[in-house]
């Protein structure tokens, strides 16, 4: 997706050979026009899959997921990273390790929103080592729902997330595939 790659080049900041900061348009400040185009791109790639729900993880996956949900006409569920007074009974629960924050979190989805009749598209802002995706897949599996695939805004192709997911038979569609962040420069795969 050329417009996304251009945005990464112009506004992304390489913090290290493993960390790309995109808080100017994706995971702190959000560019609504770009997210609308991201949502459309995911909808076009998964339109014929019979998707009934989109699942993401709070917080940075919400904007692209909502835009894809709007395009596909389906609800969006975001896994919460902590339990609150309103999210405490009949939950699907999993653990996820955050590469960026270097912490483990418990995530949860209410069982009333996801069931075995659902065919799910997973959307997230980044794919690195696949830990967040695997935690979401675990939650979806607890519900007995099926998975159409994973839509990733930015993939760090130099990490093993894609290989892990594809080896388990999951379809992965990434809008921007980063080959390298070496020397403070973003290099794309395609």
Swiss-Prot record:
GO terms for molecular function: xanthine phosphoribosyltransferase activity. It comes from the Bacteria. One of its GO terms (cellular component) is cytoplasm. 5-phospho-alpha-D-ribose 1-diphosphate binds at residues 128-132. Keywords: Cytoplasm, Glycosyltransferase, Purine salvage, Transferase. Its EC number is 2.4.2.22. It is found in: Cytoplasm. Its main location: cytoplasm. Xanthine binds at residues 20, 27, 156. Converts the preformed base xanthine, a product of nucleic acid breakdown, to xanthosine 5'-monophosphate (XMP), so it can be reused for RNA or DNA synthesis. This is Xanthine phosphoribosyltransferase.
């Amino acid at each position: 997706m050329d417009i996304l790659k251009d945005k990464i080049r112009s506004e992304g900041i390489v913090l290290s050979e493993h960390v790309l900061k995109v808080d100017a348009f994706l995971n702190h400040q959000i560019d609504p026009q770009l997210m609308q185009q991201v949502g459309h791109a995911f909808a076009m790639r998964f339109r014929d899959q019979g998707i009934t729900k989109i699942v993401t993880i709070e917080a940075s996956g919400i904007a692209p997921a909502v835009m894809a949900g709007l395009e596909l006409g389906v609800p969006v569920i975001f896994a919460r990273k902590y339990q609150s007074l309103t999210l405490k009974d009949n939950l699907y629960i999993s653990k996820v390790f955050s590469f960026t924050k270097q912490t483990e979190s418990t995530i949860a989805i209410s069982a009333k929103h996801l069931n075995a009749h659902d065919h799910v598209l997973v959307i997230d802002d980044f794919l690195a080592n696949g830990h967040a995706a695997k935690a979401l897949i675990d939650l979806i599996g607890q519900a007995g729902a099926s998975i159409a695939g994973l839509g990733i805004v930015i993939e760090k192709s130099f990490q093993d997330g894609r290989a892990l997911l594809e080896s388990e038979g999951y379809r992965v569609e990434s809008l921007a595939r980063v080959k390298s962040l070496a020397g403070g420069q973003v290099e794309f795969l395609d």
